[in-house]
């Protein structure tokens, strides 16, 4: 049986920790002038993948 291959785009976007999967925040690429500084600071922080999406992400990462 051949090796399982992960989705390369997903492998670049997600980091796997002990029990959770980390992801970066969205809404940070363009049209940034109208967004407040506090929101921009908050968006810099990484977040965890929601429980509804964990199984799909794990399947993409072959976990």
From Swiss-Prot:
Pfam families: Ribosomal_L35p. GO terms for cellular component: cytosolic large ribosomal subunit. GO terms for biological process: translation. SUPFAM superfamilies: L35p-like. GO terms for molecular function: structural constituent of ribosome. Keywords: Ribonucleoprotein, Ribosomal protein. InterPro entries: Ribosomal_bL35 (IPR001706), Ribosomal_bL35-like (IPR021137), Ribosomal_bL35_CS (IPR018265), Ribosomal_bL35_sf (IPR037229). Belongs to the bacterial ribosomal protein bL35 family. PANTHER family: 54S RIBOSOMAL PROTEIN BL35M, LARGE RIBOSOMAL SUBUNIT PROTEIN BL35M. This is Large ribosomal subunit protein bL35. It comes from Campylobacter fetus subsp. fetus (strain 82-40). The gene is rpmI.
């Amino acid at each position: 049986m051949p090796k399982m291959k992960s989705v390369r785009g997903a492998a670049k976007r997600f980091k796997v920790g002990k029990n959770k999967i980390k992801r970066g925040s969205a809404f940070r690429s363009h049209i940034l002038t109208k967004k407040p500084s506090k929101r921009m600071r908050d968006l810099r922080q990484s977040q965890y993948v929601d429980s509804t999406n964990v199984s799909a992400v794990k399947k993409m990462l072959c976990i």
